[in-house]
């Protein structure tokens, strides 16, 4: 979902610069800009054997900036789609069938349920850590957390004797710590960027440690005041700080790490129902077993969500009032407004 952050042309050029690498996306119809960049299915033979590995790529593009999606359409697979995945693999007669999934942990579990006999799902998107993976209904599922802290290593042992068969499969999350040496070329690029003295310029002082929630609320208050709006909302993922802002001097580096996207602030005219629907639409359930994650910070009002099969919301907003709402352009662009200006 982040591959389009710099636009379709940048993604196309990036892919064209790696001619020996195959890119696969199965649940999307691509624009002319990305024509011939992706395949819906890839089969790779293992040299010296009769074994081949088939790959399907599935992605959840809900969080992709809609301004970068011109000409691209996609569907989130449902139960029938999952059932048809096995049939697609059978058509190509591969020995090993692998799904590269950016659908999230919950959708991967559904895929395991409705698509038995997939050998491996290499998953992501919801930042779940499975140190040794899950093995269910013959399918091995791998998730390795987030922030490049770990890399997944999946091992499949197979027999080349007829009939060719898989003997075992396993996966593990390997920590990318100081024991693994840095690439010298990449390390130098990072050093030149992060060593810019401008980043160390002090722009303020934090009188105490500031939590992620408080930072999000401060964002909202700032854009509410700057835009002279009635209220403000901000998406949780727009605050990129991992945990908190330390007590003491605040530098440009700190600010950049909090918000590196250069978002523009927009205002919209919205009713109580519109605002509550936006908040509920960002109340995501990453798995069937867990509750939702609050994805929207606010100022100028408060709200409460009652989790359940059908989550509901109450707020201090008033019926019959049209509010001027300030928000980042990302949040604005990724919600279909019943009423907006």
Regions found by a protein language model. Give the residues of each.
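Bulky hydrophobic/aromatic packing residues
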Residues: 2, 72-74, 130, 211, ...
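Generic surface-pattern signal
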Residues: 16, 91, 191-199, 228, ...
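Basic, gly/Ser/Thr/Pro-rich low-complexity segments located predominantly at protein N termini
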Residues: 6, 59-62, 109, 128-129, ...
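Intrinsically disordered, low-complexity segments enriched in small/polar residues
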Residues: 52, 69, 193, 202-205, ...
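A short C-terminal boundary segment appended to hydrolase-like catalytic domains
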Residues: 158-249, 256-259
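Generic, ordered loop/turn and secondary-structure boundary motif
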Residues: 3, 73-75, 204, 256-262
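Acidic, metal/ion-coordinating pockets
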Residues: 1-185, 214-222, 267, 284
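Feature captures C-terminal
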Residues: 20-27, 39-41, 217-341
């Amino acid at each position: 979902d982040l591959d389009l952050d710099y636009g379709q042309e940048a993604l196309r050029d990036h892919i064209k610069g790696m001619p020996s690498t195959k890119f696969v996306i199965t649940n999307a119809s691509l624009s002319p800009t990305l024509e011939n960049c992706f395949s819906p299915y890839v089969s790779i033979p293992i040299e010296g054997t009769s074994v081949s590995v088939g790959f399907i790529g599935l992605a959840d593009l809900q969080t992709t900036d809609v301004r970068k999606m011109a000409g691209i359409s996609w569907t989130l697979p449902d139960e029938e789609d999952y059932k048809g995945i096995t049939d697609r693999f059978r058509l190509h007669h591969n020995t090993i069938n692998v799904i590269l999934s950016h659908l999230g942990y919950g959708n991967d579990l559904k895929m395991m349920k409705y698509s038995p006999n997939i050998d491996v799902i290499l998953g992501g998107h919801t930042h779940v850590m499975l140190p040794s993976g899950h093995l269910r209904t013959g399918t091995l599922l791998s998730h390795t957390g987030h922030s490049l802290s770990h890399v997944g290593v999946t091992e499949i042992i197979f027999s080349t004797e007829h009939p060719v068969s898989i003997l075992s499969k396993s996966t593990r999350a390997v920590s990318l710590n100081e024991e693994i040496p840095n690439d010298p070329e990449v390390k130098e690029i990072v050093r030149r960027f992060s060593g810019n003295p401008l980043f160390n310029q002090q722009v303020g002082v934090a009188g105490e440690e500031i939590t992620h929630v408080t930072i999000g609320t401060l964002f909202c208050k700032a854009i509410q005041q700057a835009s002279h709006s009635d209220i403000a909302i901000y998406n949780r993922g727009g605050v990129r700080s991992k945990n908190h802002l330390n007590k003491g001097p605040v530098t440009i580096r700190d600010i950049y790490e909090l918000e590196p996207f250069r978002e523009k602030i927009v205002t919209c005219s919205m009713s109580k129902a519109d605002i509550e629907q936006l908040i509920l639409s960002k109340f995501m359930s990453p798995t069937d077993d867990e509750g939702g994650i609050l994805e929207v910070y606010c100022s100028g009002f408060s709200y409460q969500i009652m989790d359940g099969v059908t989550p509901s919301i109450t707020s201090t907003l008033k019926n019959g009032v049209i509010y001027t709402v300030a928000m980042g352009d990302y949040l604005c662009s990724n919600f279909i407004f019943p009423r907006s200006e």
